[in-house]
Protein backbone atom coordinates (compact mmCIF):
# COMPACT_ATOMS: atom_id res chain seq x y z
CA UNK A 1 0.00 0.00 0.00
CA UNK A 2 1.22 3.49 -0.82
CA UNK A 3 -0.22 6.89 0.08
CA UNK A 4 -2.51 8.52 -2.47
CA UNK A 5 -1.65 11.25 -3.23
CA UNK A 6 1.93 10.26 -2.60
CA UNK A 7 5.55 10.39 -3.71
CA UNK A 8 5.51 9.56 -7.45
CA UNK A 9 9.08 8.24 -7.65
CA UNK A 10 8.38 5.69 -4.93
CA UNK A 11 5.19 4.65 -6.71
CA UNK A 12 7.10 4.23 -9.98
CA UNK A 13 9.83 2.16 -8.32
CA UNK A 14 7.32 -0.15 -6.66
CA UNK A 15 5.19 -0.41 -9.82
CA UNK A 16 8.20 -1.68 -11.75
CA UNK A 17 8.49 -4.60 -9.33
CA UNK A 18 4.92 -5.57 -8.51
CA UNK A 19 1.43 -5.53 -9.96
CA UNK A 20 -0.10 -5.48 -6.47
CA UNK A 21 0.42 -1.82 -5.58
CA UNK A 22 -2.67 -0.34 -3.92
CA UNK A 23 -3.33 3.38 -3.28
CA UNK A 24 -4.23 4.19 0.34
CA UNK A 25 -6.13 7.39 1.22
CA UNK A 26 -4.81 10.22 3.37
CA UNK A 27 -6.53 12.95 5.35
CA UNK A 28 -5.43 16.01 7.33
CA UNK A 29 -3.35 13.74 9.59
CA UNK A 30 -1.60 11.73 6.89
CA UNK A 31 -2.14 8.08 6.03
CA UNK A 32 -5.58 6.87 7.12
CA UNK A 33 -5.10 3.85 9.39
CA UNK A 34 -7.76 1.15 9.45
CA UNK A 35 -8.62 -2.45 8.65
CA UNK A 36 -8.14 -1.77 4.93
CA UNK A 37 -4.36 -1.88 5.57
CA UNK A 38 -4.28 -5.27 7.29
CA UNK A 39 -3.92 -7.46 4.20
CA UNK A 40 -0.79 -5.84 2.80
CA UNK A 41 2.79 -7.06 3.14
CA UNK A 42 4.26 -3.54 3.03
CA UNK A 43 3.00 -0.02 3.74
CA UNK A 44 4.94 2.96 2.41
CA UNK A 45 4.35 6.23 4.27
CA UNK A 46 5.84 9.72 4.71
CA UNK A 47 4.70 10.63 8.24
CA UNK A 48 6.82 13.69 9.06
CA UNK A 49 5.72 15.85 6.14
CA UNK A 50 3.46 13.82 3.89
CA UNK A 51 4.37 14.09 0.24
CA UNK A 52 2.86 16.15 -1.32
CA UNK A 53 0.41 17.65 1.19
CA UNK A 54 2.95 18.41 3.93
CA UNK A 55 0.67 17.24 6.75
CA UNK A 56 2.19 15.56 9.82
CA UNK A 57 1.00 12.27 11.26
CA UNK A 58 0.27 12.73 15.00
CA UNK A 59 1.72 10.46 17.66
CA UNK A 60 -1.59 8.71 18.34
CA UNK A 61 -1.95 7.65 14.71
CA UNK A 62 1.67 6.51 14.55
CA UNK A 63 1.04 4.26 17.52
CA UNK A 64 -2.14 2.98 15.87
CA UNK A 65 -0.23 2.18 12.66
CA UNK A 66 2.48 0.32 14.58
CA UNK A 67 -0.13 -1.70 16.44
CA UNK A 68 -1.78 -2.67 13.16
CA UNK A 69 1.59 -3.68 11.70
CA UNK A 70 2.37 -5.86 14.72
CA UNK A 71 -1.04 -7.53 14.69
CA UNK A 72 -1.15 -8.12 10.92
CA UNK A 73 2.51 -8.97 10.21
CA UNK A 74 2.97 -5.88 8.03
CA UNK A 75 6.28 -4.13 7.30
CA UNK A 76 6.25 -0.32 7.27
CA UNK A 77 8.62 1.61 5.00
CA UNK A 78 9.01 4.99 6.68
CA UNK A 79 10.36 7.60 4.26
CA UNK A 80 11.28 10.39 6.65
CA UNK A 81 12.47 12.97 4.16
CA UNK A 82 12.36 16.57 5.43
CA UNK A 83 11.90 15.31 8.99
CA UNK A 84 14.38 17.93 10.23
CA UNK A 85 12.71 20.77 8.33
CA UNK A 86 10.30 21.91 11.03
CA UNK A 87 9.40 25.50 11.79
CA UNK A 88 6.36 24.99 14.02
CA UNK A 89 6.12 22.91 17.19
CA UNK A 90 8.39 20.02 18.09
CA UNK A 91 9.25 17.01 15.91
CA UNK A 92 7.18 13.90 16.59
CA UNK A 93 9.16 10.69 17.23
CA UNK A 94 9.75 8.67 14.10
CA UNK A 95 7.84 5.44 13.67
CA UNK A 96 11.17 3.63 13.84
CA UNK A 97 11.98 5.12 17.25
CA UNK A 98 8.64 3.78 18.54
CA UNK A 99 9.03 0.38 16.88
CA UNK A 100 9.55 -2.45 19.36
CA UNK A 101 9.20 -5.37 16.94
CA UNK A 102 11.39 -4.48 13.92
CA UNK A 103 8.34 -3.68 11.81
CA UNK A 104 9.76 -0.43 10.40
CA UNK A 105 12.36 0.17 7.70
CA UNK A 106 13.46 3.78 8.17
CA UNK A 107 14.74 5.64 5.11
CA UNK A 108 16.26 9.12 5.25
CA UNK A 109 18.31 11.54 3.19
CA UNK A 110 20.43 14.65 3.64
CA UNK A 111 19.74 16.06 0.18
CA UNK A 112 16.89 18.30 1.39
CA UNK A 113 18.58 19.76 4.44
CA UNK A 114 22.12 20.00 3.07
CA UNK A 115 22.35 20.10 -0.72
CA UNK A 116 20.47 18.38 -3.58
CA UNK A 117 23.77 17.27 -5.11
CA UNK A 118 24.81 15.48 -1.92
CA UNK A 119 23.47 12.03 -2.77
CA UNK A 120 23.84 10.52 0.68
CA UNK A 121 21.03 8.64 2.35
CA UNK A 122 20.67 6.10 5.11
CA UNK A 123 18.51 3.18 6.23
CA UNK A 124 17.79 2.01 9.77
CA UNK A 125 16.47 -1.54 9.93
CA UNK A 126 17.14 -5.00 11.31
CA UNK A 127 20.80 -5.98 10.90
CA UNK A 128 19.89 -8.99 8.74
CA UNK A 129 18.07 -6.73 6.28
CA UNK A 130 20.93 -4.23 6.25
CA UNK A 131 23.33 -7.03 5.29
CA UNK A 132 21.08 -7.98 2.36
CA UNK A 133 20.71 -4.36 1.28
CA UNK A 134 24.47 -3.82 1.33
CA UNK A 135 24.90 -6.83 -0.94
CA UNK A 136 22.27 -5.51 -3.35
CA UNK A 137 23.78 -2.04 -3.32
CA UNK A 138 27.15 -3.46 -4.31
CA UNK A 139 25.57 -4.73 -7.53
CA UNK A 140 24.65 -1.13 -8.41
CA UNK A 141 27.54 0.86 -6.95
CA UNK A 142 30.53 -0.40 -4.99
CA UNK A 143 30.07 2.21 -2.28
CA UNK A 144 29.36 5.94 -1.98
CA UNK A 145 32.36 8.24 -1.86
CA UNK A 146 34.32 7.55 1.33
CA UNK A 147 35.64 11.11 1.27
CA UNK A 148 32.12 12.57 1.20
CA UNK A 149 30.94 10.23 3.95
CA UNK A 150 33.87 11.10 6.24
CA UNK A 151 33.50 14.82 5.54
CA UNK A 152 29.80 14.66 6.33
CA UNK A 153 30.47 12.71 9.52
CA UNK A 154 32.90 15.39 10.66
CA UNK A 155 30.45 18.15 9.71
CA UNK A 156 27.76 16.54 11.88
CA UNK A 157 30.05 15.69 14.81
CA UNK A 158 31.25 19.30 15.08
CA UNK A 159 27.68 20.58 15.38
CA UNK A 160 27.58 22.31 12.01
CA UNK A 161 24.57 20.30 10.87
CA UNK A 162 22.55 21.45 13.89
CA UNK A 163 23.42 25.05 13.04
CA UNK A 164 22.47 24.46 9.41
CA UNK A 165 19.09 23.03 10.43
CA UNK A 166 18.46 26.06 12.65
CA UNK A 167 19.21 28.45 9.76
CA UNK A 168 17.07 26.38 7.41
CA UNK A 169 14.17 26.31 9.85
CA UNK A 170 14.29 30.07 10.39
CA UNK A 171 14.41 30.74 6.63
CA UNK A 172 11.56 28.36 5.85
CA UNK A 173 9.42 29.73 8.66
CA UNK A 174 9.78 33.21 7.20
CA UNK A 175 9.06 32.06 3.65
CA UNK A 176 6.11 29.89 4.63
CA UNK A 177 4.53 32.81 6.50
CA UNK A 178 5.04 35.04 3.46
CA UNK A 179 3.50 32.60 0.99
CA UNK A 180 0.55 31.77 3.25
CA UNK A 181 -0.17 35.46 3.79
CA UNK A 182 0.15 36.22 0.08
CA UNK A 183 -2.16 33.35 -0.88
CA UNK A 184 -4.75 34.54 1.62
CA UNK A 185 -4.65 38.06 0.14
CA UNK A 186 -4.29 37.35 -3.57
CA UNK A 187 -5.98 33.95 -3.98
CA UNK A 188 -8.59 33.53 -1.23
CA UNK A 189 -10.58 31.26 -3.56
CA UNK A 190 -7.90 28.58 -3.08
CA UNK A 191 -7.73 26.17 -0.16
CA UNK A 192 -4.23 25.79 1.29
CA UNK A 193 -3.32 22.83 3.49
CA UNK A 194 -1.79 24.00 6.81
CA UNK A 195 1.87 23.03 7.23
CA UNK A 196 4.38 22.85 10.07
CA UNK A 197 7.51 22.25 8.03
CA UNK A 198 8.95 21.45 4.64
CA UNK A 199 9.57 23.64 1.64
CA UNK A 200 6.28 23.61 -0.26
CA UNK A 201 2.54 24.04 0.21
CA UNK A 202 -0.36 22.03 -1.22
CA UNK A 203 -3.12 24.09 -2.81
CA UNK A 204 -6.59 23.06 -3.98
CA UNK A 205 -7.75 25.18 -6.90
CA UNK A 206 -11.31 26.40 -7.44
CA UNK A 207 -13.64 24.03 -9.26
CA UNK A 208 -13.25 24.07 -13.01
CA UNK A 209 -9.59 25.17 -13.06
CA UNK A 210 -7.14 22.70 -14.58
CA UNK A 211 -3.80 22.53 -12.76
CA UNK A 212 -2.00 21.59 -15.98
CA UNK A 213 -3.46 24.51 -17.91
CA UNK A 214 -2.79 26.88 -15.01
CA UNK A 215 0.84 25.75 -14.83
CA UNK A 216 1.32 26.58 -18.50
CA UNK A 217 -0.30 29.98 -18.15
CA UNK A 218 1.58 30.82 -14.94
CA UNK A 219 4.83 29.89 -16.69
CA UNK A 220 4.18 32.60 -19.26
CA UNK A 221 4.04 35.04 -16.33
CA UNK A 222 7.38 33.83 -14.99
CA UNK A 223 5.98 31.63 -12.22
CA UNK A 224 6.68 27.90 -12.06
CA UNK A 225 4.19 25.70 -10.22
CA UNK A 226 3.87 21.93 -10.00
CA UNK A 227 0.57 20.38 -11.11
CA UNK A 228 -0.67 17.89 -8.55
CA UNK A 229 -1.82 15.24 -11.04
CA UNK A 230 1.49 13.37 -10.89
CA UNK A 231 1.10 12.66 -7.17
CA UNK A 232 -2.12 10.69 -7.60
CA UNK A 233 -2.40 7.05 -8.59
CA UNK A 234 -5.08 8.10 -11.09
CA UNK A 235 -4.85 11.64 -12.41
CA UNK A 236 -8.43 11.61 -13.71
CA UNK A 237 -10.58 13.68 -11.41
CA UNK A 238 -7.58 14.96 -9.45
CA UNK A 239 -6.47 17.77 -11.75
CA UNK A 240 -7.32 20.64 -9.41
CA UNK A 241 -4.31 20.59 -7.06
CA UNK A 242 -0.93 22.30 -7.32
CA UNK A 243 2.19 22.30 -5.18
CA UNK A 244 3.96 25.62 -4.65
CA UNK A 245 7.61 25.35 -3.63
CA UNK A 246 9.34 28.12 -1.70
CA UNK A 247 12.47 26.52 -0.26
CA UNK A 248 14.83 27.74 -2.98
CA UNK A 249 13.14 31.09 -3.61
CA UNK A 250 14.28 34.37 -2.11
CA UNK A 251 11.82 35.73 0.44
CA UNK A 252 11.85 39.08 -1.34
CA UNK A 253 10.13 37.73 -4.48
CA UNK A 254 7.46 35.50 -2.89
CA UNK A 255 4.77 38.17 -2.63
CA UNK A 256 5.20 39.26 -6.26
CA UNK A 257 5.29 35.64 -7.41
CA UNK A 258 2.04 34.78 -5.65
CA UNK A 259 0.46 37.92 -7.12
CA UNK A 260 1.38 36.69 -10.61
CA UNK A 261 0.07 33.22 -9.74
CA UNK A 262 -3.23 34.78 -8.66
CA UNK A 263 -3.42 36.81 -11.87
CA UNK A 264 -2.92 33.64 -13.91
CA UNK A 265 -5.58 31.90 -11.83
CA UNK A 266 -7.98 34.78 -12.41
CA UNK A 267 -7.36 34.56 -16.15
CA UNK A 268 -8.18 30.84 -16.08
CA UNK A 269 -11.41 31.42 -14.17
CA UNK A 270 -12.54 33.93 -16.80
CA UNK A 271 -12.09 31.43 -19.61
CA UNK A 272 -15.23 29.64 -20.78
CA UNK A 273 -15.53 26.01 -19.69
CA UNK A 274 -14.95 23.31 -22.29
Regions inferred by a protein language model and the residue ranges of each:
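Conserved glycine-rich beta-strand-loop-beta hairpin in the small C-terminal domain of fold type I
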Residues: 6, 153, 170-180, 191-204, ...
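PLP-dependent enzyme catalytic core of the Aspartate aminotransferase-like
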Residues: 220, 235-274
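Residue-level detector of anion-binding/catalytic polar loops
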Residues: 20, 75, 224
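Conserved core of the PLP fold type I
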Residues: 1-72, 84-85, 90-98, 172, ...
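Short hydrophobic/aromatic beta-strand micro-patches
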Residues: 124, 202-204, 245-247
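Active-site PLP attachment segment
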Residues: 97-132, 144
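Conserved Walker B
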Residues: 80-82
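Structural signature of PLP-dependent enzymes
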Residues: 134-140, 158-180
Amino acid sequence: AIEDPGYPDARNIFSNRTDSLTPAPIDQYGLVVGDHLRNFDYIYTTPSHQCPTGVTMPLSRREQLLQLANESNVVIIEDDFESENNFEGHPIPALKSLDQHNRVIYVGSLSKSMAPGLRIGYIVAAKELIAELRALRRLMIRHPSTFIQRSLSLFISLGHNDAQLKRLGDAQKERSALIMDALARYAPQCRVTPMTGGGSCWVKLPDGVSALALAEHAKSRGVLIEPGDVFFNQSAGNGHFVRLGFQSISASVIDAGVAQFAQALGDMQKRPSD
